[in-house]
Amino acid sequence: MVHLRRTTAPYWWPIPRKIGGVWVVRSSPGPHSLAYSLPLAIIIRDVLKYAKTMREARYIISRGYVKIDGVIRKDYKFPVGLMDVVEIVPTGEIYRVVPDEKKYYALIPISSEEATLKLLRVEGKTAVKGGKLQLHFHDGRNLIVSQDVGRHIKTFDTVLYDLQNKNIKMHIPFKLGAYAVVTRGGNVGFSGKLYEIVWTLKRRQSVVALKRNEEVRRTILDYIMITGSEAPVIKISP
């Protein structure tokens, strides 16, 4: 389906529910799921306000004026999600999609120096031919690395990825004391030190606690991303 009903779209999408028609554009299959992504056209029209209508938004996108993670995207339904870098080519404005306590996901302006950097959470790894390892990341990206590099990187770790050179610049291990942010659920956008881990048989459902100053919030392991050893290594808040 190309569209879905406004009333059934993810609740955090910044669209009017009772005006503007019955339908709204639906994210196409891609690096992020429907529940945790925004169609590119909605970002152009409703978030950044570069267009007043869907027709105008589609025109801007079809002209190649928008890059996602450094690649021109002309599909107005392209799903944009967690930690993606959005660049408006004619103006030079660059944004990153980050978890936000009020908006669920928000776009924050970033510098051109950070435009080539992206935090990727490791979802798993597999052995491939040649004695190498393939890392699988949260945005659907895969990367083949040597055993020397890959053996130190584990599921739930985070890497700082260079979008331009397509390599890993930094490895941030998942461990107590690391800085993390909640990426989904009721505590989305909350960030702090990883304070506690209560392991369960289903690892992704393990309970973790983040502490910021004296405030402690709990969520499940699958809903957090490590962003730095002591503090975020790149800008992830306004």
UniProtKB/Swiss-Prot annotation:
Cellular component aspect of the GO annotation: cytosolic small ribosomal subunit
Keyword RNA-binding on entry: yes
GO molecular function terms attached to this record: rRNA binding; structural constituent of ribosome
Domain S4 RNA-binding: 38-110
Domain of life, per lineage: Archaea
UniProt keyword DNA-binding present: no
Gene3D superfamilies xref list: 2.30.30.30, 2.40.50.740, RNA-binding S4 domain (3.10.290.10)
PROSITE patterns found in the cross-reference section: S4
Gene Ontology terms: biological process: translation
Pfam families (UniProt xref): Ribosomal_S4e, RS4NT, S4
Keywords noted in UniProt: Ribonucleoprotein, Ribosomal protein, RNA-binding, rRNA-binding
Record family assignment: Belongs to the eukaryotic ribosomal protein eS4 family.
Name of the protein in its database record: Small ribosomal subunit protein eS4
Organism the protein comes from: Pyrobaculum islandicum (strain DSM 4184 / JCM 9189 / GEO3)
Taxonomic lineage: Archaea, Thermoproteota, Thermoprotei, Thermoproteales, Thermoproteaceae
